[in-house]
């Protein structure tokens, strides 16, 4: 018989650095999930990834206090900042001050990596979404 799902929890955790301190510990603890078990499993699953990369994770927890988790690709903003080699977007996007520039090829690379997490039918649709995010961060898309 299948386990009864008690709920789902969405978190964003840095790769390789899950620990029981806030915000992870309290979020898991109040739902009765074994915090250290999650931290060990998550860190083991992300050990090959770049340390500190933000990873969205969806934790499904069951009434018997067990859990499973699914990891997604890092947010588009992370990829945009990494490709543009900047630490943050423009403070006033669209007002003249550009935070950096990206090429269509860089946008396509990001779109291919994020395709399974995006709500897009094809790569062109995914690229359009990512270009919109880039403009919202004050990045200029050229080429």
UniProtKB/Swiss-Prot annotation:
Role according to the record: Forms part of the ribosomal stalk which helps the ribosome interact with GTP-bound translation factors.
GO molecular function ontology, one term from the record: large ribosomal subunit rRNA binding
Keywords for this protein: Methylation, Ribonucleoprotein, Ribosomal protein, RNA-binding, rRNA-binding
Annotated Gene Ontology cellular component terms: cytosolic large ribosomal subunit
CDD domains named among the record's database cross-references: Ribosomal_L11
Record NCBIfam families: L11_bact
Higher taxonomy: Bacteria, Pseudomonadati, Pseudomonadota, Alphaproteobacteria, Hyphomicrobiales
Presence of keyword Protein biosynthesis: no
Cited InterPro entries: Ribosomal_uL11, Ribosomal_uL11_bac-typ, Ribosomal_uL11_C, Ribosomal_uL11_C_sf, Ribosomal_uL11_N, Ribosomal_uL11_N_sf
GO biological process: translation
Organism expressing this protein natively: Rhizobium etli (strain ATCC 51251 / DSM 11541 / JCM 21823 / NBRC 15573 / CFN 42)
Protein name from the UniProt record: Large ribosomal subunit protein uL11
């Amino acid at each position: 018989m299948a386990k009864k799902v008690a709920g789902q929890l969405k978190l964003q955790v840095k790769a390789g650095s899950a620990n029981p301190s806030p915000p992870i510990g309290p979020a898991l603890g109040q739902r009765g999930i074994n915090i250290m078990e999650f931290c060990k499993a998550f860190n083991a699953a992300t050990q090959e990834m770049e340390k500190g990369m933000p990873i969205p994770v969806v934790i499904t927890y069951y009434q018997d206090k067990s859990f499973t988790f699914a990891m997604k690709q890092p947010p588009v903003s992370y990829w945009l900042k990494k490709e543009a080699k900047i630490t943050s977007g423009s403070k006033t996007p669209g007002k003249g001050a550009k935070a950096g520039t990206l090429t269509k090829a860089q946008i396509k690379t990001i779109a291919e990596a994020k395709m399974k997490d995006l709500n897009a039918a094809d790569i062109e649709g995914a690229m359009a979404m990512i270009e919109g995010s880039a403009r919202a961060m004050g990045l200029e898309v050229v080429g």
